[in-house]
Each structure stands twice: as C-alpha cells, then as structure tokens.
Amino acid sequence: MFFTCGPNEAMVVSGFCRSPPVMVAGGRVFVLPCIQQIQRISLNTLTLNVKSEKVYTRHGVPISVTGIAQVKIQGQNKEMLAAACQMFLGKTEAEIAHIALETLEGHQRAIMAHMTVEEIYKDRQKFSEQVFKVASSDLVNMGISVVSYTLKDIHDDQDYLHSLGKARTAQVQKDARIGEAEAKRDAGIREAKAKQEKVSAQCLSEIEMAKAQRDYELKKATYDIEVNTRRAQADLAYQLQVAKTKQQIEEQRVQVQVVERAQQVAVQEQEIARREKELEARVRKPAEAERYRLERLAEAEKAQLIMQAEAEAESVRMRGEAEAFAIGARARAEAEQMAKKAEAFQMYQEAAQLDMLLEKLPQVAEEISGPLTSANKITLVSSGSGTMGAAKVTGEVLDILSRLPESVERLTGVSISQVNHNKPLRTA
C-alpha cells in the first residue's frame, strides 16, 4: 500500500525489511500492511515566545527579557532528520515546541547572566547573535535548526532602566538645546547661503535647461532629418521593389504570352500545313486541272477570235472597198448628172431655174409650216369679220405661200410669174 505526505511532513517506515528505517520527507512510500508500520513527524516551523523573568545580569541587576525564535525540524538533512526522529518520533508539535522552548530559554538566561544591562539594552544585535549561536549548536544535535531569533522586549521592576535613561535624557536634552541654538544659527547662515545657492542654482538650472532644450531641439532636428531620410529611403526602396516586382511579373507575363503565342503560332502553322495539304488535295489539284482546261479553252477561243477578227477585218476591208467603189460610182453618176443639168440649164436657162425652184418649193413650204406641226395648241383672236376656225388657219398658210414668189424674186432676182408666162407650152 502506498502512503504519501506533503512537503511539511516526513514519514518513517520500519519493520520487516526496513532496517534501518526508511525516512521520506515530502513524497510517497510503499508499506506492507501488518508486517511494516509507518509513523509521521511534522516539519512545520514552530514560533517560540522565549521569556526569561527576573534574571540577574553580571552586575546583579534583575531584568526580564522576551525573545521570539523560529525553529523547525530539518527534513532535507538526513542526519538531522534521523536525530529528530530518535528524539521526537511519536511526539506532538506542542511537545516538540516545549522541548525547544525550554532549551532556548536556558541558553537565553545563560547569556543574560554574562552580560550587563547596558550591553543588553544598547547592543541588542550582539545579544541576539550570541543566543542564536549557542542555541543553534545545541538544538542541531536534536535535529532542530533555529531559523531566526529576535530580542523582543527588555524591562525591569526596579526602574533601573528608567534611572539609567534619566542621566542620558538630561544630557540629551542639554545637547538638544545647545544643538537647537546652534542649529538655528547655522540654519540662518545656511538659509542665506541656501537662498544664494538657490538663486545661483536656479540660474544655472535655467541655463542648463536652455542648453538642454537647445541640444534637444538640435538632436530632434537631426533625428527628424535622419528619420525622414530613412523613411524616404525605405519608401524609395519599397517603390523600387514594387517596380521590380511589377517588372518581373510583367516579364513573366510577357514570357508566358510569348510561349502562348509561340504555341499558337505552332498550332496555326500545323493548322496551315493541314489546310494546305487539304487545299492541295481538294482545291489546288482540281484547280490546276481546271486552269489547264481553261487555258486550253482560252487558247482555242483566242485562236477562234483571231480568225474571226481576221475575217471581220477582211470583210470590213472588202466592204470599205465596195463602199468606196459605190461612192466613186455615185459621185461619177452625180457628176454626169450635174454635167447634164448644167447642159440643160445652159440650154433652158430660166426654165431650168424655174424647174429647180419648183422642185424645191415643197421643201420650202414644209419648212415654213414646220413650226405649226410642232405646236400643241393654237389660239386665234378675231375681230368678228372674216373666216373663223380652221379656215382661218388655212387662209393664213395660203397667204404666206402666195407671198413666196415675191420673196424668191427679192432673193434671186428671178420672177416666177414672168418665167412661167414666157415658158412655151409642152406638147405631148
């Protein structure tokens, strides 16, 4: 069976197979029931109020002393723990405290007997150290260590301490009055000097403050310049890094685009090659065959057109020669006719002229009445006497024709009525 204990306690296991007994301070231990037994001892710190009433000092003056001591069983030291177990195992904390208290009180009384009241009263530290030293060397053999010892109180029933203090008090009061007067004197001197030093110190302080402010402003300006410079450098470096990063990204993007474009070009080239092959198979070969056929047809049509052009040229040439011959024959016939007319005019003179005039007279009448044929509407205005309507138009035309011989005579000097009067009658 396992048993445990805290750091303020120690366990001692004895019995079967436990020789010497096992001591465990703050831990656990295995115990065989019935054949082994376990005991515990406290390691708590004990506070002891050590009182020594009416102890005679070296000069025979009885006084009472009260001290405060802190003691405990030392569990970390195996030898001291073994000694404590031998001395106090099975005892309560109160019993252990009583034993330690009696031991300390005895040593305290012994130290008091070897010292005077003045030594104990004036040098408490020396008294405490002697009690601590003597008691520790004795209690350590019991496994107890003295943690601390302090002198708490000193008093007596004979007013020895009070009487001892009166002379000292009177001397102290005298010294106090003298010291007070000297202090006031020195205080006045020191006060004046202090005021002077204060003014000087204040001036120096203001000067130092001004210098410090100046140095602060200068250093602050320097630091601000450096900080702004570093910040500007950092911003510039950041911008440069951003620009470099953007440039790298752009270069990578361009490289990717170049690769993609190269891949696209390769794909397009493959597609072009495939289409060229397809075009070669589907279009070019049939087109070349068709071109060859069309070239043959064009050459045949060209030859045919050349032959047709040559035939047309020959036909035009022959037609031109025929027309030229016809024109020449017509001209010769007209010339002969004109010659014959000239002979007839020579022979008949005025009769021939009259015949020619009469031959052209219908044309003259046609030209005179031509404007009337192109008129869309004719409006006649009459005063109420004479003919009306179409008879009026006919009369007007006949009136114009009746005046024609006069016009011919004025233009040519030939009188149609006279020539007609002198013309001999034709016989059948």
UniProtKB/Swiss-Prot annotation:
GO terms for biological process: axon guidance; axonogenesis; cellular response to exogenous dsRNA; dsRNA transport; endocytosis; extracellular matrix disassembly; intracellular signal transduction; plasma membrane raft assembly. High expression in brain, white adipose tissue, heart muscle, skeletal muscle and lung. Low expression in spleen, liver and testis. SMART domains: PHB. Transmembrane segments: none annotated. It comes from the Eukaryota. One of its GO terms (cellular component) is presynaptic active zone. Pfam families: Band_7, Flot. CDD domains: SPFH_flotillin. It is a peripheral membrane protein. One of its GO terms (molecular function) is ionotropic glutamate receptor binding. The keyword Secreted does not apply. The modification Phosphothreonine is found at residue 387. It is found in: Cell membrane; Endosome; Membrane, Caveola; Melanosome. Keywords: Cell membrane, Endosome, Membrane, Phosphoprotein. PANTHER family: FLOTILLIN-1-RELATED, FLOTILLIN-RELATED. Heterooligomeric complex of flotillin-1 and flotillin-2 and caveolin-1 and caveolin-2. Interacts with ECPAS. May act as a scaffolding protein within caveolar membranes, functionally participating in formation of caveolae or caveolae-like vesicles. This is Flotillin-1. It comes from Mus musculus (Mouse).
